[in-house]
Amino acid sequence: MAGSNVLQIEPLTPAIGAVLRGVNLAEPASDGLIDDIRQALLRHQVIFFEDQDLTPTQQRDFAARFGDLHVHPLYDTDNRHPEIMVIDNHVDNPTDNNFWHTDVTFIETPPMGAVLHAKQLPPVGGDTMWASMTAAYRALSTPMQRFLEGLEAVHDFAYAFTPQGLAGSQAGAERYAKAVAENPPVIHPVIRTHPETGEPGIFVNSVFTSRIKGLRREESRALMDFLNRHVQQPEFVVRWRWTPGAVAFWDNRCTQHRAVDDFLPHRRVMHRATILGERPVFSPG
């Protein structure tokens, strides 16, 4: 293992993922430790911390060291901390995130990252997988890279979220209508340059990207189908088996992820803090 005097870093795959040991996220972290964690995140794209006993306040405070926090317009949040999204899946509320996606790309400045804490786990199953979009880009042919670098895509809240499940109550219907009105479709580059590493990566996903701008519908669908299959290759992926208290921190600018929906009828409760980022751009060369 390699790392700083505090952190021990164990890579999980050549492309993506590492376990960080030697840090208690419940304790206030020095600026130096935060920088070490940031550098590990940039290098490994998703990092994991085991056996972390975090309150929602502590999780929020740790995530806020990396930027302003996002409050999701639809999902339930902690009663005292709207920045902490509560993902509580069980028989009466099955998971809806079991598709490959990058979080919240339907806003002008999608998140730079997210911190996910395991609060209650099923006895088996319920893993999460992450895929490296920079590794996926590098695996494309040079002509395909150049073609994609000239394209933009539409990301749309209403494409991903429907009124189903909310329409049963007036409050739910109003909440959905408000979210749609406040989140019109946005345009992002198909290939995004990472603002800190300078690496290019694929920045479309099956959940929020409705179409490729400028292409005919059948052309857009064919290209999206190809890219959505391409990014799932196992060489780009790390699969994390959750343990009680574990924390995942991923770079949302260069990854996709998905939950594995195999744990019902058991319950799985996760808390997520989402860190806002910057407007995606592509910088040639």
Describe each PLM feature range.
Residues 2-247, 252-285:
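Non-heme Fe(II) oxygenase catalytic core, chiefly the N-lobe of the double-stranded beta-helix
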